[in-house]
UniProtKB/Swiss-Prot annotation:
Reactions catalysed, as given in the entry: a quinone + NADH + 5 H(+)(in) = a quinol + NAD(+) + 4 H(+)(out)
Membrane topology annotation: Peripheral membrane protein
A Gene Ontology molecular function term of the record: NADH:ubiquinone reductase (non-electrogenic) activity
Gene3D superfamilies, A to Z: Cytochrome-c3 Hydrogenase, chain B (1.10.645.10)
Organism: Bordetella parapertussis (strain 12822 / ATCC BAA-587 / NCTC 13253)
Function: NDH-1 shuttles electrons from NADH, via FMN and iron-sulfur (Fe-S) centers, to quinones in the respiratory chain. The immediate electron acceptor for the enzyme in this species is believed to be ubiquinone. Couples the redox reaction to proton translocation (for every two electrons transferred, four hydrogen ions are translocated across the cytoplasmic membrane), and thus conserves the redox energy in a proton gradient.
PROSITE patterns tied to this protein: COMPLEX1_49K (PS00535)
Major localisation: membrane
Matches recorded under Pfam families: Complex1_49kDa (PF00346)
Protein name, UniProt field: NADH-quinone oxidoreductase subunit D
UniProt keyword annotation of NAD present: yes
Family statement: Belongs to the complex I 49 kDa subunit family.
Assembly with partners or alone: NDH-1 is composed of 14 different subunits. Subunits NuoB, C, D, E, F, and G constitute the peripheral sector of the complex.
Length: 418
């Protein structure tokens, strides 16, 4: 009698629904997944090792390139770890700016997650709407750092510069954009960055309503997500879940509330929590988080308008002196030269700093030996713990559901492979 064998299928590494270079070896019985084996490492760039050969400041841009959808949140954990070792604290205005940009980054990430997840499942319109809003938030990145993605804006002791009074303007009309459209876009960018962000926060809840109209009660969307990839609260904790993956299973754990950092303890916001622990609940948690992030951004804008002040500490052994001081004072020039050639030395010790990243708990464990470079840098990526559970979440589901589960895990391989 012929022996019945399971069928092995390679999913990726170039599959459009794989969110990067994921290779999945699926063992199938017909169309039902019996085992899912993720093969990682295809985007490994030795970030942790590279950081050991750069000064503390030079290693900062590597952080942007880990989870390349949530750039400033990665930087935040890194600079917080350095600040712990140095025993310094950023000025209050810098802390508010950091929190505001952390939440802008959270919205950026969730828009990408929501849009790509819907696209994977077969709903294309949401992806296009989400990128319409992402464009505005990318302009905020560009206004403060000059870069739309890899900002390198945070610094140990504060941020690179204060918020600008003007926004980048669009150029002349082209075959893609008429003169009227360009003028309308520039009108929204006529004030300061805070004006632009405030205008965005007024519009954004209506945009989220649009996404929910398209998806939340859509019967096809619900059929594809409800009851798929269920993880109960105890199992979620055992697997090391954090962020929306953990909260979707009904565990109200959010570092912004449980271990507040910067000025999160002064912010008024709620932590959305799921009930069933399936893909649909995780989707609802992310949508609700975008609304809460919008609330936090509004509070930051209001405070920043009324409280001018320094955005960097005054210690010129860590923070660069101003350009005018550098050109008129020899001592400041020496500080500047030493800072950008040799960098600053960090006293021996070790520190762990974690932030509530859009994907979960993103942590940096930093060991210093008194030199101007990290002795050891360990990155705790939330997606790594989530991907290991893919086998458990996908087992017994159809092959099409694997795409839904990968989408709900919100995987980005920059942080997983490092």
């Amino acid at each position: 009698m012929a022996e019945i064998k399971n069928y092995t299928l390679n999913f990726g590494p170039q599959h459009p629904a794989a969110h990067g270079v994921l290779r999945l070896v699926l063992e199938l019985d017909g169309e039902v997944i019996q085992r899912a084996d993720p093969h990682i490492g295809l985007l490994h760039r030795a970030t942790e090792k590279l950081a050991e050969h750069k000064t503390f400041i030079q290693a900062l841009p590597y952080m942007d390139r880990l989870d390349y959808v949530s750039m400033m949140c990665n930087e935040h954990a890194y600079v917080m770890a350095i600040e712990k070792l140095l025993g310094i604290e950023a000025p209050l205005r810098a802390q508010y700016i950091r929190v505001m940009f952390d939440e802008i980054t959270r919205v950026l990430n969730h828009l990408m997650s929501l849009g790509s997840h819907a696209l994977d499942v077969g709903a294309m319109a949401v992806f296009l709407y989400a990128f319409r809003e992402r464009e505005d938030l990318m302009d905020c990145y560009e206004a403060v750092s000059g870069a739309r993605m890899h900002a390198a804006y945070y610094r140990p002791g504060g941020v690179y510069r204060d918020l600008p009074d003007t926004m980048p303007q669009y150029g002349d009309s082209s075959k893609y954009r008429g003169e009227k459209e360009v003028r309308a876009m520039n009108d929204a960018r006529s004030g300061s960055l805070l004006d632009f962000i405030e205008d965005f926060t007024n519009r954004f809840p209506g945009c989220v309503d649009e996404y929910e109209t398209l998806l939340t009660d859509n019967r096809i969307w619900k059929q594809r997500l409800v009851g798929i990839g269920v993880v109960d609260p105890d199992r979620a904790k055992a697997l090391g879940f954090t962020g929306p993956m953990l909260r979707g299973s009904g565990v109200a754990w959010d570092l912004r509330k449980t271990q507040p950092y910067e000025v999160y303890d002064l912010m008024d916001f709620d932590v959305p929590v799921g009930v069933n622990g399936d893909c649909y609940d995780r989707y609802l948690v992310r949508v609700a988080e975008m609304r809460e992030s919008n609330r936090i951004i509004r509070q930051c804008v209001e405070w920043l308008r009324n409280n001018p002040g320094p955005v960097m500490i005054e210690n010129h052994k860590i923070a660069p002196p101003s350009r005018t001081a550098m050109k008129s004072n020899m001592e400041e020039l020496i500080h500047h030269f030493k800072l950008f050639s040799e960098g600053f030395h960090v006293p021996p010790g070790e520190a762990y700093a974690a932030v509530e990243h859009p994907k979960g708990e993103f942590g940096i464990y930093l060991v210093a030996d008194g030199a101007n470079k990290p002795y050891r840098l360990k990155i705790r990526a939330p997606g790594f713990a989530h991907l290991q559970s893919l086998d458990e979440m996908a087992r017994g589901h159809m092959i099409a559901d694997a795409v839904t589960i990968i989408g709900t895990q919100d995987i980005v391989f920059g942080e997983i492979d490092r």
